[in-house]
A protein has these predicted regions:
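Conserved positions within well-ordered secondary-structure segments
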Residues: 511-922
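Short, strongly hydrophobic transmembrane alpha-helices
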Residues: 95-121, 125, 380-381, 424-429, ...
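Negatively charged linear elements and acidic catalytic determinants
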Residues: 1-100, 302, 337-339, 345, ...
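Glycine/proline-centered hinge or cleavage motifs at structural transition points of membrane proteins
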Residues: 383, 406, 412, 837-843
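A hydrophobic alpha-helix feature that marks transmembrane segments and, especially
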Residues: 371-400, 412, 475-489, 534, ...
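Alpha-helical transmembrane segments of integral membrane proteins
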Residues: 66-98, 349-358, 388-414, 418, ...
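Peri-transmembrane interface segments
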Residues: 338-375, 777-806
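Structured, solvent-exposed hinge/loop segments at the ends of secondary-structure elements
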Residues: 37, 50-56, 60-66, 111-248, ...
Length: 922
């Protein structure tokens, strides 16, 4: 009630101030009347009593003024009057207002966009309930090279082991499992190849996102007797089924099994595998040991409230090592298990936020961008501060008059800060509008196919934290822009302004060094931003022009999926069987006949992405042991992929068809095993194929049928190194053999036309061999490289480039404003010079030399600062030094050219001064 009363009082004071004055008059009259009554009772006449009462009470207006000064509402009223005066003043100088708001809006808008990207990717990337407690169990092979080793990443375990982890842990509120792959979905309209995520039946309740239509998968769906169901993604529902609202309840055949669609998820839901099309429940009964369920699942867990990541990691490590003792083939000899927060995992080397086998991580790029945008905000603030200083100099006579009339220094400072606040708030609104369009642009960029892996569940928008940042930026810009000009205006010298010409010329020259210093700071900061953006661009160029050892152009990749058991999980061992390999060979022969296809090869890897670890290789009778990548491929790989033979020959048709134990090695393996000697005709021994797993523990201890053990291969050829660990890593030792161990199930189809245009034809040719064959056609190999190798640095360039461009634009505005103002102050000087015989070129040179001096000072400071700061960028660039002279030289040249261009217009104006007019100029 007290609050409501105070609120009513405030509103009354603000909007009905005349009533407050009337009430005070009435109260004062009553006090005087009461005192007069007392005096009258003491024997004085009424007239004398009233006279003495008024004398004792004093001036009524004085008391009313004292009451007003003690009322806090008066301060609000004073601020409101300052606000009104600021609006009237700013309306008189619309060009200044437009320039200031434009500069600040650019800074605030750019800062808001980058902060939205930064916050939403780092802290709001997961759409699940209580996402802050989501963690991903991971495993690291301690015998591999750091976190970038092949076995680093998600922890995979058996279904039965997942049940054990659930029962034995005390740190997880819940833990679920999921897998990934491809299925064939059929209905009366056609056949679709879709990405599937088999999930434990409680996974949708765990994630906690409400479906757009219908329901999600429930624990009852995982019971063996439950009817087969599935849930569809928004993307698939809209793209493949035209957003049919009547789709629920329809039955589809998925890998030969009828399943009923029970739900469609919202657009943001991308759980359990980015870009999944459908989700199916994994049938599971605690304690079951059916062989087709002994595949492996990735895990996702939610910590109990109050449990730290460190304590959860310690307990998980103990449990998983206990499980590893029971299934030693599933795990490396030395490893550790731990948990990472879901956001940290997604942004790290194992998630979407890193270049394949690289130190370039989106998380670090985002921190660099945040620092860059704060520099941009400083440039905008110094720009506006320069404009405000110029304006304050012109208004010094006005400030002097107000000071003479009784305005305190604090009141003058407050008035100018109010003007800065009006500018900043208006710029904030304009900046938020710019940011809204900017974030639409970011979403458009991120949702391009090449960048589809970045922030699949992230929504970029003006949410509460982003708006809070924008308001904070507004408050800081008010202080940074307005405080120094306001304090300088508050120290105005009265006498020169009251007796002088009132134009502020002396003050302008007095403040010139400070304003020049602000321009130097702007130039220096822009140099830092441009150098950072330039290094990232140069790095991206180097990255995209690495010789990978093969030709990725016009290559379409087709990956065959293993058949699935009752659980919905893949039977990978069956893929390596003779029956499975024979079926793939029929597909190869069929595709070779397709018009537009130049060649077809089959192997077990995607070029550029493995294998980069595998079994141990040695020379029979020797002691040197080398871990080598092992690629099982056919006779067409070398020509189809454009690999270069160095010596000897490639695998022949006879080698592949008769499973000959011959091998082609790359230069790295030949050099490591035989030095400078000739490797042709020599032998290598593969110690054990059981060490060769496709990803983590995906084989889960199940070996392909009859793999050779300690097999000896004769080297028949040497091929140029292929970068199978990504473009940034040196080539790993590799051997190429016939499909003997895991089988070859990935096709590389080289086309004579655009690969994407062949997708439908390739699909139909494979289905002509076997309509039930399950496969997925990946993007053309160039696009695949784009997504997994170039997307993260491209994202950094896409954001840092515009920031650097805006910084350069603001510097041009800053240099132009300072030089234009300097020219206006020196109009008389230029007129006198020209009257004494100076030519237009002489005046032009004076102005350009002053501008060039500012630029050189800023460039020197900026280059020195860049040399110190770019070391923080060193881990995010590749193929170029952090102090690359070409980048620094290009940036300096760009700043000099644009800076002199900004000086040119004021210089030409100075050179065009009429001496007669200038000599009359005040």
């Amino acid at each position: 009630m007290k609050f409501l009363a105070s609120l009513r009082s405030l509103c009354s004071a603000l909007f009905h101030s005349e009533h407050i004055d009337d009430e005070m008059d009435e109260e004062m009259r009553l006090h005087i009347q009461n005192r007069a009554d007392d005096l009258e009772r003491s024997g004085l006449s009424r007239e004398e009593a009233e006279r003495r009462a008024r004398i004792e009470f004093g001036g009524v207006e004085r008391f009313k003024e004292e009451v007003r000064e003690t009322a806090w509402v008066t301060h609000l009223d004073s601020l409101f009057r300052d606000f009104q005066y600021a609006i009237r003043n700013l309306r008189k100088d619309r060009r200044f207002v437009a320039a200031a708001i434009f500069a600040l809006a650019l800074g605030i808008g750019a800062a808001t966009v980058v902060f939205s990207v930064f916050y939403n990717l780092l802290f709001n990337a997961v759409a699940a309930k209580e996402a802050g407690r989501l963690v991903v169990p991971v495993r690291q092979d301690l015998d591999k090279a750091g976190d970038m080793g092949w076995d680093a990443g998600a922890l995979y375990c058996r279904l039965s082991d997942l049940d054990s982890i659930r029962q034995q842990n005390h740190v997880f509120e819940d833990i679920v499992g999921y897998d990934g792959g491809v299925v064939q979905l059929r209905d009366s309209a056609g056949t679709y190849q879709l990405n599937v995520a088999p999930v434990t039946a409680d996974a949708f309740e765990f994630y906690g996102v409400s479906p757009l239509l219908g329901r999600g998968i429930t624990p009852e769906d995982g019971k063996p007797e439950a009817a087969p169901v599935f849930v569809m993604s928004y993307k698939t529902w809209k793209g493949e089924f035209n957003a049919d609202p009547q789709i629920l309840g329809k039955s589809y055949t998925i890998d030969g099994e009828p399943r009923t669609l029970v739900g469609v998820m919202p657009a943001r839901f991308q759980a359990y595998g980015r870009l999944r099309d459908i989700w199916v429940p994994i049938p599971w009964t605690s304690g079951t040991t059916r062989s087709d369920q002994e595949s492996s699942l990735a895990l996702l867990a939610r910590l109990k409230p109050g449990v730290s990541v460190e304590s959860a990691s310690a307990e998980l490590d103990v449990i998983v090592k206990r499980l590893a003792a029971a299934h030693p083939d599933d795990y490396p000899k030395r490893f550790r298990a731990r948990v990472l927060s879901a956001n940290e995992y997604l942004m790290g080397p194992s998630g979407y936020g890193a270049v394949f086998h690289s130190d370039i991580q989106l998380k670090n790029i985002l921190y660099d961008l945040l620092a860059a945008v704060l520099m941009l905000l400083l440039i905008a603030c110094s720009n506006v501060a320069n404009l405000l200083l110029a304006r304050a100099t012109v208004r010094e006579k006005e400030m002097a008059v107000r000071a003479v009339l009784g305005a305190s220094r604090g009141r003058l400072v407050r008035q100018l800060l109010m003007e800065s606040s009006v500018l900043a708030v208006t710029a904030c609104l304009a900046g938020c509008a710019m940011a809204w369009f900017g974030m639409k642009g970011v979403e458009t960029i991120v949702h391009q196919k090449a960048w589809a892996n970045i922030g699949a569940e992230t929504v970029f928008g003006l949410n509460a934290p982003v708006l809070l940042f924008s308001l904070t930026a507004t408050a800081l810009t008010t202080l940074l822009c307005g405080l120094v000009p306001a304090l300088r205006a508050g120290r105005v010298d009265l006498q020169p302004q009251l007796v002088g010409n009132g134009k502020g010329t002396s003050a302008g020259l007095r403040h010139g060094k400070f304003r020049a210093g602000l321009v130097v700071a702007q130039v220096a900061l822009s140099i830092v931003l441009l150098v950072g953006a330039g290094l990232m661009m140069r790095s991206l160029y180097q990255l995209t022009h690495v010789d990978m050892g093969f030709n990725p152009k016009n290559i379409l990749v087709v990956a065959f999926a293993p058949p699935r058991g009752h659980s919905g999980l893949p039977d990978r061992a069956k893929m390596a069987s003779q029956e499975g390999q024979a079926l793939i060979q029929k597909d190869v022969e069929r595709l070779k006949e397709l018009p537009g296809v130049a060649a077809v090869a089959v192997n077990n890897t995607i070029p550029g992405y493995g294998p980069n670890h595998g079994p141990q290789v040695t020379v029979p009778g020797g002691t040197r042991v080398e871990e080598a990548g092992l690629s099982e491929c056919d006779e067409n790989c070398v020509n189809t992929l454009g690999m270069r033979m160095i010596a000897g020959r490639w695998l022949s048709t006879g080698d592949v068809r008769t499973d000959q134990y011959v091998a082609v090695v790359n230069q790295r393996l030949a050099r490591d095993m035989f030095g400078d000697g000739n490797p042709l005709g020599r032998q290598i021994q593969v110690k054990a194929f059981t060490q060769f797993r496709s990803r983590g523990s995906r084989w889960a201890g199940k070996k392909p049928p009859d793999p050779p053990q300690d097999a000896v291969f004769q080297i028949v050829g040497v091929v140029a190194d292929v970068k199978n660990s990504g473009p940034q890593q040196p080539a790993v030792p590799m051997a190429f053999i016939a499909p003997l161990a895991t089988g070859a199930f990935i096709l590389q189809v080289r086309t004579n036309v655009e690969p994407a245009s062949m997708i439908h034809a390739v699909q139909e040719q494979i289905w002509a061999v076997d309509r039930d064959e399950i496969f997925w056609i990946l993007d053309p190999l160039e696009d695949f490289l784009e997504q997994h190798t170039y997307a993260v640095p491209e994202f950094g360039v896409a954001l840092s480039g515009p920031l650097a461009g805006v910084a350069l634009l603001l510097v041009m505005v800053g240099v132009f404003s300072v030089m234009a103002y300097t020219v206006s102050l020196q109009t008389q000087e230029f007129g006198i010079r020209m009257a004494l015989g100076a030519q237009r070129g002489d005046v032009l040179g004076i102005v350009l030399r002053k501008g060039f001096a500012l630029l050189v000072s800023g460039i020197l400071v900026g280059v020195l600062a860049s040399y110190g700061l770019t070391r923080f960028l060193a881990s995010q660039i590749w193929g170029v030094s952090a102090t690359d002279p070409w980048t620094f030289g290009g940036v300096v040249a760009l700043v000099v050219i644009t800076g002199l261009a900004a000086c040119l217009l004021p210089a030409r104006r100075a050179a065009g001064v009429d001496p007669l007019v200038a000599l009359r100029y005040e």
